[in-house]
Regions:
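Local sequence-structure signature of Cys/Sec-based thiol-disulfide redox active-site neighborhoods
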Residues: 1-24, 28-34
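Thiol/selenol-based redox catalytic cores and closely related redox-interacting motifs
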Residues: 34-114
Length: 114
């Protein structure tokens, strides 16, 4: 099985999710450090659609920049625009497999798509 993780190595939950993926037999992991290689708008919308999420659901609301930019009460298009300009606003880790996409918070959620 192939799995892709949009990963931030500075995030403990992201590191723990990656460890679960790497320790699971038969899983071939692709790691994308999304702060260095952000997803495109279309890619992020596709991931959210597969996960049953909206951009608001994928907003890293506790990131100070979210409040500074007035995103806590913004519409999805505004949130998505901000995510494209500032990828730190994308909540992580997102994991995609053949079985679906999950925002893996807590990290054990990744097991639902393995």
């Amino acid at each position: 099985m192939k799995a892709t993780i949009w990963h931030n190595p500075r995030c403990g939950t992201s590191r723990k999710t990656l460890a679960i993926l790497e320790e699971t037999p038969g899983v071939e992991v692709t790691v994308i450090e999304y702060l260095k290689t952000p997803p495109t708008r279309e890619e992020l919308l596709r991931l959210y659609a597969r996960a049953g999420m909206t951009p608001r659901d994928g907003l890293r609301a506790k990131e100070p920049l979210a409040a500074e930019m007035g995103l806590l009460n913004a519409d999805d298009a505004t949130i998505l625009d901000a995510m494209m300009a500032h990828p730190i606003l994308i909540e992580r880790p997102l994991v995609e497999t053949d079985k679906g996409v999950k925002l893996c918070r807590p990290q054990e959620k990744v097991r639902e798509i393995l």
